[in-house]
Every structure is written in C-alpha cells, then in structure tokens.
C-alpha cells in the first residue's frame, strides 16, 4: 500500500493566497446584499464553510480555523483582536475586511502547520 504525502513545497503560510480565497467567498455570499439580521447565521456559516473548503482543496499540510463576524454598519465602528502562540516560521494568520454601505464583515483564518 502506498503512503499518501500531502504536497508542502513552500515553507510558511501564504497569507495572500488565503486572502484572495476568502475575499472571493465573501463576495459570493454578501455581494449585492443589504444587511438583514435574519440572514446573518446563514451568511456567516456559508462564508466559513466555503472558505474552509477552498483552503483545504489547496492540499497543504495545515489545520485551519476560520471565524467570521458580520455586523450592521454604524458610526460607532467595529473592533476585533486575536492573539496566538505558535511557530511563526510555519503557522500564520490572515484577516480579510469587507464592507458595503450597510454592513461590515471580518474573516480571520488561522493556519497551523501539520508536522508529519
């Protein structure tokens, strides 16, 4: 029986690649929509599930954590923060901020390298 080795040619997490993937997922779900509280659960679930599926399809040796927050746009602003204790040479994070005239969306991707 042959062993399967996941391709991992590059060292470190490619945040630009992840950013582009997540941005496309957000655009696909929220593009053209106005804020509607009744749709938030569906929208956030779709964004994290699609983002995760596309990241996994890259076939890289990472475990991913994807979070998403969608809030109604207001003059009061919206602030988030996160902190991680990990190997900065192989693990990484990417934050995507998206907005339209009625809402703001923040997606965080945390990638933790799998050491085989």
Curated annotation (Swiss-Prot):
GO MF annotation terms: dynein intermediate chain binding; identical protein binding
Top-rank taxon: Eukaryota
Pfam families per UniProt: Tctex-1
Modified positions (3'-nitrotyrosine) in chain numbering: 4
Entry keyword Transmembrane helix: no
Keyword flag Transport: yes
Alphabetical keyword list: Cell cycle, Cell division, Centromere, Chromosome, Cytoplasm, Cytoskeleton, Dynein, Kinetochore, Microtubule, Mitosis, Motor protein, Nitration, Nucleus, Transport
GO BP annotations, alphabetical order: cell division; microtubule-based movement; regulation of mitotic cell cycle
Compartment list: Nucleus; Cytoplasm, Cytoskeleton; Chromosome, Centromere, Kinetochore
GO cellular component: cytoplasm; cytoplasmic dynein complex; kinetochore; microtubule; nucleus
Major localization listed first in the record, in broad terms: nucleus
Subunit structure of this chain's protein: Homodimer. The cytoplasmic dynein 1 complex consists of two catalytic heavy chains (HCs) and a number of non-catalytic subunits presented by intermediate chains (ICs), light intermediate chains (LICs) and light chains (LCs); the composition seems to vary in respect to the IC, LIC and LC composition. The heavy chain homodimer serves as a scaffold for the probable homodimeric assembly of the respective non-catalytic subunits. The ICs and LICs bind directly to the HC dimer and the LCs assemble on the IC dimer. DYNLT1 and DYNLT3 compete for association with dynein IC (DYNC1I1 or DYNC1I2).
Membership in a protein family: Belongs to the dynein light chain Tctex-type family.
Protein function: Acts as one of several non-catalytic accessory components of the cytoplasmic dynein 1 complex that are thought to be involved in linking dynein to cargos and to adapter proteins that regulate dynein function. Cytoplasmic dynein 1 acts as a motor for the intracellular retrograde motility of vesicles and organelles along microtubules. Probably binds BUB3 as part of transport cargo. Required for the efficient progression through mitosis.
Protein name (database record): Dynein light chain Tctex-type 3
């Amino acid at each position: 029986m042959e062993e399967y080795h996941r391709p991992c040619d590059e060292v470190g997490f490619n945040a630009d690649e992840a950013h582009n993937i997540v941005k496309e997922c957000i655009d696909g779900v929220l593009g053209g929509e106005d804020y509607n509280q009744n749709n938030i659960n569906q929208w956030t679930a779709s964004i994290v599930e699609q983002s995760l599926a596309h990241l996994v399809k890259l076939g890289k040796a990472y475990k991913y954590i994807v979070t998403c927050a969608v809030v109604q746009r207001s003059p009061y602003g919206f602030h988030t923060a996160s902190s991680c204790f990990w190997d900065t040479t192989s693990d990484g994070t990417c934050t995507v901020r998206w907005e339209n005239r009625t809402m703001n969306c923040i997606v965080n991707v945390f990638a933790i390298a799998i050491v085989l």
